[in-house]
Amino acid sequence: MMRVGIIGLGTIGRAHATSYTKLDEAQIVAVADLRAEELRADASLDRLLPPGREAITWYEDYRDLLSSEELDCVDICLPTYLHAEAAIAALESGLPALCEKPMALRLEDCDAMIEAAAKAQKPLMVAQCLRFWNEYELIRTSADAERYGKLLSMQLWRGSATPSAQSWMRDASLSGGAILDLHIHDVDYVQYALGLPMRIYAQGGCSVSPERGYDYVLASYDYGKGLQVSAAAHWADVSLPFAYRAHVRYEQAYLQMDSSHDPLLRIYRQAGEPELPQLAGDDAYTNEIRYFCDTVRNGCEPERCTPLAARNAVGLVMAEIASIERGVPVEVTEFVRS
């Protein structure tokens, strides 16, 4: 049984904790969170932390967790501005690290994380969950295999209400704003499905204040050969539920995924009713955490979700910001590594 320490038990930390309850090979044994005493008293956590929160060792400072516990790996679910610091500390302690997306706020921090993983010779994986999302994977593999003929276009979108006034995410110096925190899901998926584009042209803005960062963006990715690819994202000061969509056109089919659909995916052919595939398997969080645990257990690198790919996802967002500010398309080679 793998012994796991979770660093940060907020919204995403609880989502990850839920996934560990579905795995036979791993168990959370320690949690670090500034609210440790408050959380330890929360009976609702018993279902997330079997055999119960009283069996968990709690820490307010993740450094104490790293120095005191006998662990096989850590799962870092802290706010974005703390990702690099915590991941590097874990790796320097000799522990494999799963880190929530985005990798970090700055490319130099991403590079420092990659360097720390190489020096420690321990796996580092960033949790870009769309790489493990069954419907998105069907879209990608259909393009690779030309299951419906050649891919012609892909439009991705996601949006939500702006985080609450008390949330650290409203401060772009801590979260990167919607363009980095929310939009990076689709940015990373584009490079996963299609590789790195040659150029990016983006439009967007800060609807409220510069402190909140770019909260709406539309980016077009140039792959040449007539392939049309775009992704958009919004934080809006309205009561908008979180939602996401993908519209993908192949020569012989149109795939439409929408978070308001059940099932999520519809496949339209030339005639007849759309196909409604029922995809088996676990949710994306469980898939990615199982993959990470397998990586740790087998002592190999996370080839499906490498640190370099996570770093380049941040680089592509930086390219979008540069395009918005310059008002012209930009070459991605300025922002990505190979």
Q: For each predicted feature, which ranges?
A:
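N-terminal Rossmann-like dinucleotide-binding module
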Residues: 1-51
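Beta-loop-alpha module in the N-terminal Rossmann-like domain of NAD(P)-dependent dehydrogenases
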Residues: 16, 54-116
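C-terminal helix-rich "cap/oligomerization" subdomain common to oxidoreductases
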Residues: 26, 73-75, 111, 122, ...
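Hydrophobic residues in well-ordered beta-strands that form the structural core
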Residues: 99, 124-126, 231, 257
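Predominantly a Rossmann-like dinucleotide-binding segment in NAD(P)-dependent oxidoreductases
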Residues: 123, 130-210, 327
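Contiguous beta-strand/loop segments that form the cofactor/metal-binding neighborhood of enzyme cores
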Residues: 181, 187-264, 289-301, 336-338
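Active-site loop of classical SDR/Rossmann-like NAD(P)-dependent oxidoreductases
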Residues: 278-290, 305
